[in-house]
Regions:
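Positively charged, low-complexity terminal tracts
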Residues: 1-85
């Protein structure tokens, strides 16, 4: 699947703790597209990215996603709703 990501999303994934080698390779091969990048992901890679981002989403006492982790929440939603996932 091809997943368009913003520069902020790309940078957040790159900076995530415990970034697996399989995703490092995906980021290294990402194609620039105007304001961001296109990630070319297999199903396994998309699942790994979804799991990594899910682990980095945090909520406040009201159950709302915290502003500093919203970028990960947006990626989870983009992957989960992608027609090729």
């Amino acid at each position: 699947m091809d997943l368009a990501v913003t520069r902020a999303q790309f940078d957040a994934v790159r900076a995530a703790k415990h970034l697996p080698d399989v995703l490092k390779k995906v980021l290294d091969k990402a194609a620039a597209n105007g304001s961001g990048y296109t990630l070319h992901l297999t199903y396994e890679e998309a699942t790994a990215l979804n799991e990594l981002c899910s682990w980095n989403v945090h909520t406040d006492a009201n159950g709302d996603v915290t502003p500093d982790t919203k970028v990960y929440d947006e990626l989870v939603r983009a992957i989960m709703t992608h027609p090729e996932f």
